[in-house]
């Protein structure tokens, strides 16, 4: 992300293609952002889902498997999972790095006080991931945020986006608002904001 312009110029000089690692969440978020921008939408918020709880920030590679409901044998021996890697997924480190990459690549802002990981299901994304002055949770239009698949009681929320990515877009005029409604898109109460999400991702 930090050297993207240089890599793109280098690829052009050598008549080759430079692309992102499609498959993982940051690149899939960028794909959605670019689609929205090419179609004339402003991107209000973009990000991904994950399983997050504030208590997980104290997790270590030695305690990580209990949070996943797995035994060490099942995770490490049978599936070959790396406890350090999977702890970074849980404690928020990887989410922070990935949202930094998306922010750098897209010019979307980071939240003013860091990621908040609100528990939000897919049918509430367009209602909640909009600016606070519009009744939502985010600081301003045009930022990144990660949503949690569990609530503060560590219970699964309905229709979570644990493995996926999303964007929130804004209608620029009444015609587009009408289209949101006419085509059955999920919106906020004003009909101005809608969300697009992808439920899964693969490592890239």
Indicate where each model-derived feature is located.
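Conserved anion/nucleotide-ligand pocket segment
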Residues: 17-19, 28-106
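Rossmann-fold NAD(P)-binding glycine/threonine-rich loop
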Residues: 1-16, 23-24, 34
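Short gly/pro/ser/thr-enriched loop/turn and capping motifs at secondary-structure boundaries
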Residues: 2-8, 25-29, 50-54, 120
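C-terminal catalytic/substrate-binding lobe primarily of soluble NAD(P)-dependent oxidoreductases
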Residues: 67-68, 72-204
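Generic structural signal for short, flexible, solvent-exposed coil/loop and linker residues
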Residues: 7, 18, 32, 156-158, ...
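Residue-identity detector for threonine
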Residues: 2, 50, 60-63, 116, ...
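General beta-strand structural signal in soluble alpha/beta enzymes
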Residues: 1-2, 18-22, 43-47, 112-114
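Short alpha-helix boundary/capping motifs
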Residues: 14, 39, 64, 127-132
């Amino acid at each position: 992300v930090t050297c993207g312009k240089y890599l793109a110029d280098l690829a052009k000089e050598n008549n080759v293609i430079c692309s992102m690692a499609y498959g993982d969440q940051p690149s899939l978020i960028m794909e959605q952002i670019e689609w929205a921008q090419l179609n004339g939408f402003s991107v209000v918020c973009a990000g991904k889902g994950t399983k997050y709880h504030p208590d997980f920030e104290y997790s270590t590679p030695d305690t990580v498997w209990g949070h996943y409901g797995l035994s060490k044998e099942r995770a490490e021996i049978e599936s070959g999972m790396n406890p350090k890697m999977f702890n970074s997924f849980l404690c928020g480190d990887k989410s922070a790095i990935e949202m930094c990459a998306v922010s750098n690549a897209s010019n979307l802002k980071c939240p003013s006080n860091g990621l908040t990981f609100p528990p939000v299901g897919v049918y509430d994304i367009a209602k909640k991931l909009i600016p606070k002055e519009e009744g939502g949770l985010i600081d301003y239009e045009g930022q990144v945020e990660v949503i949690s698949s569990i609530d503060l009681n560590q219970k699964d929320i309905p229709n979570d986006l644990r493995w996926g990515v999303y964007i929130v877009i804004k209608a620029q005029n009444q015609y587009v608002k009408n289209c949101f409604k006419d085509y059955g898109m999920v919106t906020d109460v004003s009909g101005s904001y809608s969300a697009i999400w992808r439920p899964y991702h693969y490592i890239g």
